[in-house]
Amino acid sequence: MLSIEKITQLAKENSTPLYIFDKDELADRISSIKRIVGDGVTICYAMKANPFLLDAAKKLNVKFEVCSPGEFSICERENINMSDIVLSGVNKEKHDIEHVMDNCGGVGMYTVESVSQFELLNECAAKRNITIPVPVSYTHLTLPTTSR
């Protein structure tokens, strides 16, 4: 954890307001979570949380949850390994999915929130003759958001 002295020093050396991220604290938290949940669980860092911590998170053996074209673009720019991307979110447009598949092929993971999304992913993958990993979740079957 950053000390008050270090924070004060950074504030004096830089203009304020100032955002300070403790990368060691991030590493400690992720390590702690991994110890608690065990090896069989994959930790995903939500890009929307803070894309400025990508470089630090890349070193922590996590996957990256990407919900928008902008977040995917950041991953591309930062050379995130495409096998570490989980394409998530309810607003995956056809052209966005096609862009990801054209750049990643069957690498990465795609989540599905509806039957229509499944059909769209299937159509895009079939057009490219690729197989994509899609985890099936039974946790939300009774929610209204799971309908077409």
Model-derived regions, located:
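Conserved small/polar residues in nucleotide/adenosyl-binding loops
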Residues: 139-145
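A charged N-terminal "starter" segment
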Residues: 1-132
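Short beta-strand segments
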Residues: 133-138
